[in-house]
Amino acid sequence: MNTEVLGVIAQIVLMVVLSYPLGKYIAKVYKGEKTWSDFMKPVERVMFKLSGINPNEEMNWKQFLRALLVVNLFWFLWGMVLLVTQGVLPLNPDGNVGQTAHQAFNTCISFMVNCNLQHYSGESGLTYFTQLFVIMLFQFITAATGMAAMAGIMKALAAKTTQTIGNFWNYLVLSCTRVLLPLSLVVGFILIVQGTPMGFDGKMKVTTMEGATQYVSQGPTAAIVPIKQLGTNGGGDFGVNSSHPLVNPTYFANMVECWSILIIPMAMAFAFGFYLKRKKLGYSIYGVMLFAYLVGVCINVSQEMGGNPRIDEMGIAQDNGAMEGKEIRLGSAATALWSITTTVTSNGSVNGMHDSTMPLSGMMEMLNMQINTWFGGVGVGWMNYFTFIIIAVFISGLMVGRTPEFLGHKVEAREMKIASIVALLHPFIILVGTALAAYLFVHAPAFVESEGGWLNNPGYHGLSEMLYEYTSCAANNGSGFEGLGDNTWFWNYSCGIVLILGRFVPIVGQVAIAGILAKKKFIPESAGTLQTDTVTFGVMTFAVIFIVAALSFFPVHALSTIAEHLSL
């Protein structure tokens, strides 16, 4: 037990210590300053020349968003065509067939929004070709999209008064070549050394210790895993994701993969402070996020290491904690840490089954995604926090009777309306989706049965499974309570719609707020200016997030996770 706790502490310390220099480096990359990765410039110039893009051409916020949305539409069409026709494409040694239209729609939307909602099993649902040229490609470019959007916001906020927020294409390419690719190469090399396979052979026939024959899937796993972790996408080429011994073969590999989930989202908070030359503000944001993360880690580790009271009643020892749905080689504490790390970001990868975690652990996993602000996905997590900064600044200004300001720009009704829509959309689509699914389950049993019945665990846990699915979609997370039968017409299309709304409406709103603020006349700081880099304002922002985001979900948790906990 003590060793498991020490492993958790070591991983968190590594994340915190290494995120600071990475954040400093990322800020330099986006500011165009000299860095060790400048050797990539010739490669970038070739990419821009072939694409006909001038990376030095400035864009206003509307042009920036137009480029972002148009290229995402192209990626969606690209992915749909390849997923439906993958059965006749090369690199398919196992003969996997093409996906149905509704499954391809869900898969393509999921990975296009940097999510990994997988209503299929990676070994049989995709080929090596689509793993590389749809899934892995999307894991790079959609992560880079979020980072590019944040870079544009940072440029807008750093300027006193400006009409432009940088070049989307430049930020997109820099995010891939200077951040995601180098880190992926390092992590991939470590995983190969640890035993993760890398190749294009088909299933390997093996004889088990019992003498039975088994076929083990392989593939370019060591290439896919690093970016799925670093890009906070999480989509695995195996159905059980990082629970699989070929994906996550050792405890050290598990530490590296868990570290990879959070290192860039943590670094982005520091990058903001360095970019704007307001390090105290970066520290304040980082501190609030880290506090919320550590609270979740403590709760889940204690819940999972404490065991299941129902098993205690049977007189069965639980020296290793609640081990249902967990890997012996990793243990309950490492699984609990991962469950919080993957949900506090938009990663969604798992090294154990969330459906089998204790009810309060499941509640914490969902609350992380329902709040969707603590670190979050690469780039977009900080942007969600930015939304609540605007709301907190506005409320604070009203409380003291002054015009709200943030970084020298007035926060007025237009920005507040956009921030309110973004903040309220998230609970709205989660709760409406869950209510619709619950209504159909109760009042349209024939329809539900025609789709396979949906729930293996009706009751409190069944409601939790449906709530988790829509929560995961809205947060672009992708993990799930896998007792839900979700590869159906209803779940594929309804989840796809929630995925789109949960990704693009916030990005559009947040970039618009930054662009509008940037055009306003700069107001120099004075004695009456609200200081946003203090502990007091950090607490204020935390309170606003808790009241607006978290409290919206406690009624439904009372009917699901909390009720299940009290029934144990």
Model-derived features: positions:
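Membrane-proximal intracellular helices of multi-pass ion channels
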Residues: 1-568
